[in-house]
């Protein structure tokens, strides 16, 4: 008999499941992104309570879900506005990345590449190290 995915005593996934790794990666890339630019890249808002990690290509595109080139610090309102009017964010990303890198990112986002468990596990280790480095840099 297989063990249940979740136990009744808590609602947390078991350690090192693909879901648990993705949840930790979300937190890691969000922290890294907000440490690198502690203000909204579109409007300049710097109240840390309002800042979020905004995905240019949405999270449902696995190849760029945790790609730091796809993530920028946005305030809550700009992140919501991006869903309805993507043009200002698109223009910013084109300026920031350049056309060549932007097109490569777009290609990766639309590719059907599956990100497997091993890739996620290795990416998590990279992001842990990168976060520690960013925290040392900021401190």
Regions found by a protein language model. Give the residues of each.
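A boundary/linker detector
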Residues: 1-32, 44-47, 105-139
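Short, flexible, mixed-charge glycine/proline-rich loop motifs
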Residues: 26-36, 64-69
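Histidine-centered nuclease catalytic patch
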Residues: 41-72, 82
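Short Cys/His-centered divalent metal-binding micro-motifs
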Residues: 45-49, 71-98
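Short microdomains enriched in Cys/His and/or Lys/Arg
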Residues: 59-71, 94-109
């Amino acid at each position: 008999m297989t063990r249940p995915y979740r136990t009744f005593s808590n609602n947390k996934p078991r350690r090192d499941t693909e879901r648990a790794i993705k949840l930790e990666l979300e937190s890691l890339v969000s922290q890294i992104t907000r440490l690198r630019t502690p203000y909204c890249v579109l409007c300049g808002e710097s109240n840390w309570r309002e800042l979020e990690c905004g995905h240019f290509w949405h999270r449902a595109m696995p190849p760029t879900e945790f790609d730091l080139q796809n993530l920028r610090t946005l305030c809550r309102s700009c992140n919501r506005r991006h869903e309805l009017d993507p043009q200002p964010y698109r223009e910013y990303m084109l300026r920031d990345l350049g056309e060549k890198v932007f097109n490569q990112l777009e290609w990766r986002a639309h590719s059907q590449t599956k990100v497997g468990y091993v890739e996620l596990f290795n990416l998590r280790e990279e992001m842990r190290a990168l976060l520690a480095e960013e925290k040392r840099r900021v401190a």
